[in-house]
């Protein structure tokens, strides 16, 4: 970290007793300090992040309250406090906007107010916060040439309003333009995309960056996040990406690897062979060679592995290796958590603010100290 920071009181507990997790506290930069940081320094200061999944990103819920429409309780300050105490110093808040907009693109005031309230839970806790446009690709955003101009207009309309709402927040608040943008249902949806989709996504991200920069306040040099087709680690997708020329930028990818272990679609429940480890090492080295060695910081702002018949020891081994191997390259990670424990990514019990698998949280702490 840079300069002096405000030290918070440190309190530690035995993590092995009664399923408790050791409480972790750390340094919170002042506004002047964080606003003077480069995007690389901000990534250096992030230890590990947590995703508020299946909450403000919910949609098509047939519910008057989309936040709880996918089965999670309303987000509370206590939830974010619990995340902070467990050693996460960054929170990603996925938000889907498309169902909360008038025909002219105006975002519903009550929705924006609620998003701001949840951002404040994390921001006022001294955490780094990522705010994004999440499942809008399932509502209106399709990266094809035919839709480029209309989608660019919608995307910039959303970001103008987000920028106006948050322009006075310091640089612990980070904007991520889009999430896993892809042509849903196409043959290339998860295989890296096409040249047409690369061209469109590159233009959309450039429009996002331009919109943020033009919006004034702290947004003129706020760190922003861009990515490739589907936020994919496929080499063709990464090769098709044009990173906007900007001094305050991060590249983010989503890497649940290997998917047959991490994802819910396969029965593979074990992990830890030499070839398993080599696969991760090779991926992280590729990201280092492609971006980091050229001065572009990288985060993986979604990763994790699901519970498969309580394969907790394999998951502990995976988290330990994955996070420490990424850290060697300066890559910081955000764990996906949807509060789903049966074949899901749930770690935090959002009803009582306890951790379902304290040993996984301990492994995350140990790997990211």
Regions flagged by a language model, labelled:
Residues 12-90:
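N-terminal carbohydrate-binding accessory modules
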Residues 52-75, 102-107, 146-147, 260-280, ...:
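Acidic/histidine-rich helix-loop elements
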Residues 54-58, 90, 96-101, 135-139, ...:
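Solvent-exposed loop/turn segments at secondary-structure junctions
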Residues 277-357, 362-365:
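Substrate-binding cleft of secreted/luminal carbohydrate-active enzymes
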Residues 30, 71-90, 101, 105-135, ...:
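An active-site-proximal structural segment forming one wall of the substrate-binding cleft
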Residues 1-16, 333:
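Gram-positive cell-envelope targeting signals
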Residues 24, 153-269, 273-276, 285-305, ...:
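Active-site region of glycoside hydrolase catalytic domains
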């Amino acid at each position: 970290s840079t300069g002096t920071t405000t030290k918070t009181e440190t309190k530690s507990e035995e993590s092995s007793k009664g399923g408790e997790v050791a409480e972790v506290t750390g340094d919170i930069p002042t506004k002047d300090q964080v606003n003077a940081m480069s995007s690389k320094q901000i990534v250096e200061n992030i230890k590990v992040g947590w995703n508020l999944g299946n909450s403000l990103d919910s949609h098509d819920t047939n519910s008057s309250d989309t936040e709880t429409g996918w089965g999670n309780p309303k987000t509370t300050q206590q939830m974010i406090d619990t995340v902070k105490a467990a050693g996460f110093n960054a929170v990603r808040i996925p938000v889907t906007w498309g169902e909360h907009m008038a025909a002219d693109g105006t975002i519903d005031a009550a929705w924006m107010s609620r998003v701001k309230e949840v951002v404040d839970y994390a921001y006022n806790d001294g955490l780094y916060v990522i705010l994004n446009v999440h499942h809008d690709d399932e509502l209106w955003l399709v990266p094809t040439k035919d839709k480029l101009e209309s989608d660019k207009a919608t995307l910039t309309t959303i970001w103008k309003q987000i920028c106006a709402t948050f322009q006075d927040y310091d640089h612990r608040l980070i904007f991520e333009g889009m999430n896993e943008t892809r042509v849903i249902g196409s043959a290339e949806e998860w295989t890296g995309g096409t040249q047409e989709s690369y061209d469109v996504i590159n233009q959309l991200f450039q429009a996002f960056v331009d919109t943020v920069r033009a919006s004034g306040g702290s947004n003129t040099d706020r760190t922003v996040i861009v990515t490739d087709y589907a936020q994919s680690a496929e080499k063709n997708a990464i090769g098709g990406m044009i990173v906007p020329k900007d001094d305050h930028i991060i590249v983010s990818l989503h890497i649940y690897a290997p998917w047959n272990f991490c994802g819910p679609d396969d029965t593979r429940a074990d992990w830890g062979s030499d070839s398993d480890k080599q696969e991760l090492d090779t991926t992280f080295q590729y990201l280092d060679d492609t971006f980091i060695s050229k001065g572009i910081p990288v985060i993986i702002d979604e990763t994790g592995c699901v519970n498969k018949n309580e394969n907790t020891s394999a998951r502990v081994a995976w988290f330990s290796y994955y996070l420490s191997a990424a850290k060697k390259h300066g890559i910081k990670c955000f764990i996906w958590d949807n509060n789903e424990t049966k074949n899901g990514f749930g770690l935090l019990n959002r009803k009582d603010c306890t951790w379902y698998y304290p040993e996984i949280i301990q492994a995350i702490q140990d790997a990211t100290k």
